[in-house]
């Protein structure tokens, strides 16, 4: 869609990857757990350790497309993909890259479903699945866990214009913050979220009006 397949910029060091995944393969992690319990390594192979590392997602993309620029793996739970996009934006804004492959991917596993259910974070509308999730409804009751991936191609504006690329939108600011409040719950006053928005507006030189 970006028209960059076969372009030398992919392999000349001016293209990087910034991609998120909250964890590696949980099947591989469970194989190591079995090793500790059973005192055997029969489930392990030369790729087991690599599979369980979250950075493998970004690395595999770089290997597949033979990019030689920055490689930025992000592993920040539910924000892994969005932070990957933010870091890609910064890499281009600061002049380190002209193009970045950015986004996130996650596979689903029964252990993940179990954890969110234990936290009472999942929706209980099993009889009416079409009504959930509904994050902006006052009667919302939780998440619906799924798997998937999303990828954006970020490109320096003048570079994109010069090659006649179809530009969907322009990213002009990015902001991030940390609540430093709780492992799973946001700060009740919304300070962290507000700070992230303020940082993004300041980065974009925009007023909140």
Tell me what each language-model feature is.
Residues 129-208:
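Condensing-enzyme catalytic core mediating Claisen C-C bond formation in acyl metabolism
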Residues 2-6, 37, 65, 92, ...:
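Structural signal for hydrophobic packing residues in well-ordered secondary-structure cores
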Residues 103-139:
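Phosphate/pyrophosphate-binding betaalpha-module
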Residues 1-76, 105-113, 208-209:
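Conserved beta-ketoacyl condensing-enzyme motif
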Residues 27-41, 91-94, 115-126, 188-191:
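A glycine- and small-aliphatic-rich helix-loop capping segment at beta-alpha/alpha-beta transitions
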Residues 1-5, 54-65, 70-105, 144-165:
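Active-site-proximal alpha-helical scaffold in enzymes
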Residues 14-18, 98-102, 133, 168, ...:
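Short glycine-aspartate micro-motif
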């Amino acid at each position: 869609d970006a028209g960059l397949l076969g372009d030398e910029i992919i392999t000349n060091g001016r293209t990087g990857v910034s991609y998120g995944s909250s964890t590696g393969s949980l099947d591989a992690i469970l194989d190591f757990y079995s090793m500790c319990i059973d005192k055997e390594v029969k489930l392990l192979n030369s790729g087991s350790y690599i599979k369980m590392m979250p950075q493998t997602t970004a690395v595999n993309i770089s290997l597949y497309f033979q990019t030689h620029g920055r490689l930025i793996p992000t592993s920040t739970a539910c924000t892994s993909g969005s932070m990957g996009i933010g870091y890609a934006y910064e890499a281009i804004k600061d002049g380190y890259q002209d193009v970045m492959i950015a986004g996130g991917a996650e596979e689903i596993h029964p252990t993940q479903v179990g954890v969110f259910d234990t936290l009472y974070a999942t929706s209980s509308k099993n009889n009416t699945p079409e009504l959930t999730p509904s994050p902006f409804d006052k009667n919302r009751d939780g998440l619906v866990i799924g798997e998937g991936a999303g990828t954006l191609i970020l490109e320096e504006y003048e570079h994109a214009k010069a090659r006649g690329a179809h530009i969907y939108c322009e990213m002009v600011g990015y902001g991030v913050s940390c609540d430093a409040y709780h492992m799973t719950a946001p700060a009740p006053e919304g300070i962290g979220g507000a700070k992230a928005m303020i940082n993004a507006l300041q980065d974009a030189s925009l007023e909140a009006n």
